């Protein structure tokens, strides 16, 4: 169950777009305004709907269906890497358990001879 949840979170973060419920328009994780221009591209942090913005976010900002659809969550790359590490550790533990079970079956079969 935890693996599925972590995978869902990872996929959502990789899509770089989260749709919030109308009651919660403020993202949980967000860079401070004074740092946003220095650390992220202007097409992501631009809040104006001017025609000079290029890229895929320009079409989204010009056609706002509702105010909460344009909310973006900006995270550092450490978060997805951390989630990948968790998923990798879980896969290693599962593989080790499977190998131990296989070894136990082999030893039980050899012990019967």
UniProtKB/Swiss-Prot annotation:
The gene is Ucn2. One of its GO terms (cellular component) is extracellular space. Suppresses food intake, delays gastric emptying and decreases heat-induced edema. Might represent an endogenous ligand for maintaining homeostasis after stress. Transmembrane segments: none annotated. Its main location: secreted. Residues 37-64 are annotated as: Disordered. Belongs to the sauvagine/corticotropin-releasing factor/urotensin I family. Residues 37-61 have a biased composition (Low complexity). One of its GO terms (molecular function) is hormone binding. It is found in: Secreted. The keyword Secreted applies. Binds with high affinity to CRF receptors 2-alpha and 2-beta. Residues 1-23 form the signal peptide. The keyword Phosphoprotein does not apply. Residues 24-71 form a propeptide. One of its GO terms (biological process) is hormone-mediated signaling pathway. It comes from Mus musculus. This is Urocortin-2.
């Amino acid at each position: 169950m935890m693996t599925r949840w972590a995978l869902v979170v990872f996929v959502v973060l990789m899509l770089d777009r989260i749709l919030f419920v109308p009651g919660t328009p403020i993202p949980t994780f967000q860079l401070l305004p004074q740092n946003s221009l220095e650390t992220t591209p202007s097409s992501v942090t631009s809040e104006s709907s001017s025609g000079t913005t290029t890229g895929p976010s320009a079409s989204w900002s010009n056609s706002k269906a509702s105010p909460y659809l344009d909310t973006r969550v900006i995270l550092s790359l450490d978060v997805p890497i951390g989630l990948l590490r968790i998923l990798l550790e879980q896969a290693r533990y599962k593989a080790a358990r499977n190998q131990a079970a296989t070894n136990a079956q082999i030893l039980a079969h050899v012990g019967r001879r």
